[in-house]
C-alpha cells in the first residue's frame, strides 16, 4: 500500500476540482450563471439534470419528427404562464423548475436549486408536513391534487410582500419509466400559481379569467363591502350554471350553503377588520343553478377601506376541500397562539371534517351545534342582518383579557342567541367568549355565581375567571354523531368540559395550583376583571381519562383562573417549575393529569396547624365535664371488678342461664372446667393508648351501663362453683372422658398464635392517629398495670388496686 503524503492529498483534491469544473461546463446554463456557481452548487445542479435526463429519456417520444410545437414555442408558452412549472419525485427530489419562477419568487432557477436538490429546500418549513402528506396520499395516478404552500422568496421580494409567497399547486403523478428507482419514486408534475394580492385583470366585460384559467379552473368576481356581487366573469356559467346577468346585484351570501355561513362571515369580518391590502381565504359550498353544491376555494382581496373586494374562486373536489379546510384551521390556530391580534385570531372555532363528511354534500352538524331543523321560531330571535352580526364583535375587543361569559337562560330556546342562528356545523363568534383559543368545537356557558367583594381582597389584581374550556392534547371526546347530546347545548356537557380544568379552593386563596393555564404579562386594564366568590367547602376529584363526561358534578363549582395577557399569553404566572418554559417562546401548556383529590376535606378545622409530629397544643377542642369524668372513673372501677370476677369459673347456672354470650359467641360448656393455675397462661402487659373522644357524636347518657345489670353480673359471678375450687382435685376426674384442660396442654403453634393475638391493636386503636394534634387529650385514662405479687388459696388474685 502507498502511504498518503501531503503532496498526494493535494493531487487528489486538484483532480476532484477538475472533474467538478468539467461538470459545470456540461450544465445547460448561461455563462453568467455558471460563473456564480460554487462547487457545491455545481454538484447539486448536476444531480438534478441527471435525474431529469434519465426520466425523460425513458418516456414515450412525441408524435412526428418535431412534435406538435417547436422547442422555442414551448419556451414562449411556459414564459407566458401566470405561474411556473415544477417537476419532482415523491420523495421531493427536483427534476425541473421553469425559468419563469424568477418573476414570481424573485429567485432565478439557478439560485433556488442551488440551495438544494429537494423541494423542501425551497418551501417554508411550516408547510413541509402539508406537502409530504399530499405526496404520500394514496390515489389514482391520473387524479388531480390541489394544495397550497409558501415558497421562499428573495430578500427584496420579502421586503415588499412581508413574507414568503403563498402558491396554489395543482398537479398529478405520472406513470414512471421502467426501473427500480422510479417504481418507488413516482414523478409529480405541478403548475404553481402564486396567489397574487392584486389579480391581473382580464379582457372583456367584468373581471376576466386571465391566463391562469388555462391551467387552473377559476372565475373572478368583484363585490361590495357587504359582498354583494358587483361583477363576475362569464366563466361562472361553466362551474355554477348561472349567467352573468343573473348574479349581478345579488348577495353572495344567498349562494352559500347554510353550514358555511359562519365560516364565510368570520373571514369576511377579518377582511374588514384591518385597513390596507390584506387577503382572506375560505373554503365554502356555492349553490349551482341545477340545485347541487360546488366546493369553491375563495381568495378575497380588499382594495382599501373604500375600494371593492376582489375574489378568485377555484372549484375544487371534496377531497381537496377537506385538505384545504384542515390546513386553514391549523394555520389560523397557530396564528392565534403566536400573534394574538384580532386581525389574525379566528372569531369562532372551526370544525375539521373528515373525507367521509366531504363526500356528502351536506355535512352532519358536530357536537353541540344546533341543527337547522331545531331552530326555534321564537319572536325574540328575529332576523339578524350581516351588518348587525358583524357589529357585535367590535374593534374594541381586546384579547389582553378574557371577559366573563353571560349567564345562560334555563332553556335551550333562550340559549340560542343571535349568533347561533346560522351556524351548523360551526359556531360563530360570541362577544365575550374565547373558546376558539383552545380549538374547541363550540363555546359553552355555565351557571356561575355573581362576583363577590370578599374574594377580591384575597386574589391578586391579575386574577380573573373564565368558564371557557381548556382542552389538553391528550383529552378525548365521544363521537359527536353517536353522542346523546347530538345537536344540543346542555348544561351537563358544559359543566363536564369545565370540570376538566384544575380548580382552586378559596380556603387557601394565595396558593394556586400550577396546572391552571395562566398568562404572564400584567393586565392592560384592571376594570375588566371579574372575580368569583369563595367556596366554603370544596372537594374536587379529577375524572379518569375514560370518563370524559361525568354524570354527577359538584353542586356549586367555583374555580379561579388567570387572565390572558400580551403576546406570550399562554405562560404560567406562577413560580418557575421544571416544566415551565423559560425561553420566551409562545407555547401552549397542557393541563396536568392528576389522579387524586386536589384538596382534603377537614370536617372540623382545628385552631393549630396540622403538621406531622406536632407538639401538644392548647386543649380546647375536646374537654370533659366533671360529670363525664366521674362516670368514666366509675365505669373503670366496674370493669376492673368484672375482670377480677373472671378469675373464678362460671357456675353451671351462670353459664347457661346467666349472661348471654357477647359478640355472638356460644355459651360455655358446663361440663368443661378451666383447671390449672389461677393466673392466665400469658402474662400480658397493658399498653398505653390514645383515642379521640367521640362524645360529641354519641349521646353521653347512652354510653354507660345501668347499675342494675352490672350488679346482676357480679351476683352471678359470685355464685360458688359446684365442682370445687380452682386447682383442687384431679383434672382427669373433673373432666369427663379424660379430656385435658385446653389451658394446660397447648401446642407451640397455639401459644405463638395467642402471643400474636395479644400484640394486635384493637379496631378502635388502629383507627386513631398516632400523631398528637389539637383535639386529643394528653391525659390518658387507662387500667393500672401492676403484676400480681400474692394469690389466695383458691387461686384468685389479690385485692383490686382501685
Swiss-Prot record:
Q: Where is this region: Disordered?
A: 472-555
Q: Which GO terms describe its cellular component?
A: cytosol; nucleoplasm; nucleus; postsynapse; transcription regulator complex
Q: Where is this region: Basic motif?
A: 1-13
By its UniProt entry, which SUPFAM superfamilies does this protein fall under? PYP-like sensor domain (PAS domain)
Where does the record place the PAS domain?
70-144, 203-275
The protein's assembly and partners? Efficient DNA binding requires dimerization with another bHLH protein. Heterodimer; forms a heterodimer with ARNT, ARNT2 or BMAL1.
Q: What is this protein called?
A: Neuronal PAS domain-containing protein 4
Species for this entry: Rattus norvegicus
Amino acid at each position: 500500500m502507498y502511504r498518503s503524503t501531503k503532496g498526494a492529498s493535494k493531487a487528489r483534491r486538484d483532480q476532484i476540482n477538475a472533474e467538478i469544473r468539467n461538470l459545470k461546463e456540461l450544465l445547460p446554463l448561461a455563462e453568467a450563471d455558471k460563473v456564480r456557481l460554487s462547487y457545491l452548487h455545481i454538484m447539486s445542479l448536476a444531480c438534478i439534470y441527471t435525474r431529469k435526463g434519465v426520466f425523460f429519456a425513458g418516456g414515450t417520444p412525441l408524435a412526428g419528427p418535431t412534435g406538435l410545437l417547436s422547442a422555442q414555442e414551448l419556451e414562449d408558452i411556459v414564459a407566458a404562464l401566470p405561474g411556473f412549472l415544477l417537476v419532482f419525485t415523491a420523495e421531493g427530489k427536483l427534476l425541473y423548475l421553469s425559468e419563469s419562477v424568477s418573476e414570481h419568487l424573485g429567485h432565478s432557477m439557478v439560485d433556488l436549486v442551488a440551495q438544494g436538490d429537494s423541494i423542501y429546500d425551497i418551501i417554508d418549513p411550516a408547510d413541509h408536513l402539508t406537502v409530504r402528506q399530499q405526496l404520500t396520499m394514496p390515489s389514482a395516478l391520473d387524479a388531480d391534487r390541489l394544495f397550497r404552500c409558501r415558497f421562499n422568496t428573495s430578500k427584496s421580494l420579502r421586503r415588499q410582500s412581508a413574507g414568503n409567497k403563498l402558491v396554489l399547486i395543482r398537479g398529478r403523478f405520472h406513470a414512471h419509466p421502467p426501473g427500480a428507482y422510479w417504481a418507488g419514486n413516482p414523478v409529480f408534475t405541478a403548475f404553481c400559481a402564486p396567489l397574487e394580492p392584486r389579480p391581473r385583470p382580464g379582457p372583456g366585460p367584468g373581471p376576466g379569467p386571465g391566463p391562469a384559467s388555462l391551467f387552473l379552473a377559476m372565475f373572478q368576481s368583484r363585490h361590495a363591502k357587504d359582498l354583494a356581487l358587483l361583477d363576475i366573469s362569464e366563466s361562472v356559467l361553466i362551474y355554477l350554471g348561472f349567467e352573468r346577468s343573473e348574479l349581478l346585484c345579488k348577495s353572495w351570501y344567498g349562494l352559500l350553503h347554510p353550514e358555511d355561513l359562519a365560516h364565510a362571515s368570520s373571514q369576511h369580518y377579518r377582511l374588514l377588520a384591518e385597513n390596507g391590502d390584506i387577503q382572506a381565504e375560505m373554503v365554502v359550498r356555492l349553490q349551482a343553478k341545477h340545485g347541487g353544491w360546488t366546493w369553491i376555494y375563495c381568495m378575497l382581496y380588499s382594495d382599501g377601506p373604500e375600494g371593492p373586494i376582489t375574489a378568485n374562486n377555484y372549484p375544487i373536489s371534496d377531497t381537496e376541500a377537506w385538505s384545504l379546510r384542515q390546513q386553514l384551521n391549523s394555520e389560523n390556530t397557530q396564528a392565534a397562539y403566536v400573534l394574538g391580534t384580532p386581525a389574525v385570531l379566528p372569531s369562532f372555532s372551526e370544525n375539521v371534517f373528515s373525507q367521509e363528511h366531504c363526500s356528502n354534500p351536506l355535512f352532519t352538524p358536530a357536537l353541540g351545534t344546533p341543527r337547522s331543523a331545531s331552530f326555534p321560531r321564537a319572536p325574540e330571535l328575529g332576523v339578524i342582518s350581516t351588518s348587525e352580526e358583524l357589529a357585535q364583535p367590535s374593534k374594541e375587543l381586546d384579547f389582553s383579557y378574557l371577559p366573563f361569559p353571560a349567564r345562560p337562560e334555563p332553556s335551550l330556546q333562550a340559549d340560542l342567541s343571535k349568533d347561533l342562528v346560522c351556524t351548523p356545523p360551526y359556531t360563530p363568534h360570541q362577544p365575550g367568549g374565547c373558546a376558539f383559543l383552545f380549538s374547541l368545537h363550540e363555546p359553552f356557558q355555565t351557571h356561575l355565581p355573581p362576583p363577590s367583594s370578599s374574594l377580591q381582597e384575597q386574589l391578586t389584581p391579575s386574577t380573573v375567571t373564565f368558564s371557557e374550556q381548556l382542552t389538553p392534547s391528550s383529552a378525548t371526546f365521544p363521537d359527536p354523531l353517536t353522542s346523546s347530546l347530538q345537536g344540543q347545548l346542555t348544561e351537563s356537557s358544559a359543566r363536564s368540559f369545565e370540570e376538566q380544568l384544575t380548580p382552586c379552593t378559596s380556603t387557601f386563596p394565595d396558593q394556586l395550583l400550577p396546572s391552571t393555564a395562566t398568562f404572564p404579562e400584567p393586565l392592560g386594564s384592571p376594570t375588566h376583571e371579574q372575580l368569583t366568590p369563595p367556596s366554603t367547602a370544596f372537594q374536587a376529584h379529577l375524572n379518569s381519562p375514560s370518563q370524559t363526561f361525568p354524570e354527577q358534578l359538584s353542586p356549586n363549582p367555583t374555580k379561579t383562573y388567570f387572565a390572558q395577557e400580551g403576546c406570550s399569553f399562554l405562560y404560567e404566572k406562577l413560580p418557575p417549575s421544571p416544566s415551565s418554559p423559560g425561553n420566551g417562546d409562545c407555547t401552549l401548556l397542557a393541563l396536568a393529569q392528576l389522579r387524586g383529590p386536589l384538596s382534603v376535606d377537614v370536617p372540623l378545622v382545628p385552631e393549630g396547624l396540622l403538621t406531622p409530629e406536632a407538639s401538644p397544643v392548647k386543649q380546647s377542642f375536646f374537654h370533659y365535664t366533671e360529670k363525664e369524668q366521674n362516670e368514666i372513673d366509675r365505669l373503670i372501677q366496674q370493669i376492673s371488678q368484672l375482670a377480677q370476677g373472671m378469675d373464678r369459673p362460671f357456675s353451671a347456672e351462670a353459664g347457661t342461664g346467666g349472661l348471654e354470650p357477647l359478640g355472638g359467641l356460644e355459651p360455655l360448656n358446663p361440663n368443661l372446667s378451666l383447671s390449672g393455675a389461677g393466673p392466665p397462661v400469658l402474662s400480658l402487659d397493658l399498653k398505653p393508648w390514645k383515642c379521640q373522644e367521640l362524645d360529641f357524636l354519641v349521646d353521653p347518657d347512652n354510653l354507660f351501663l345501668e347499675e342494675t345489670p352490672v350488679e346482676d353480673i357480679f351476683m352471678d359471678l359470685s355464685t360458688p362453683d359446684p365442682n370445687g375450687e380452682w386447682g383442687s382435685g384431679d383434672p382427669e376426674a373433673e373432666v369427663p372422658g379424660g379430656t385435658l384442660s385446653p389451658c394446660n396442654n397447648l401446642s407451640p403453634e397455639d401459644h405463638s398464635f395467642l402471643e400474636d393475638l395479644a400484640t394486635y391493636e384493637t379496631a378502635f386503636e388502629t383507627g386513631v392517629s398516632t400523631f398528637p394534634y389539637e383535639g386529643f387529650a394528653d391525659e390518658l385514662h387507662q387500667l393500672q398495670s401492676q403484676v400480681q405479687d400474692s394469690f389466695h388459696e383458691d387461686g384468685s388474685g389479690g385485692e383490686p388496686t382501685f
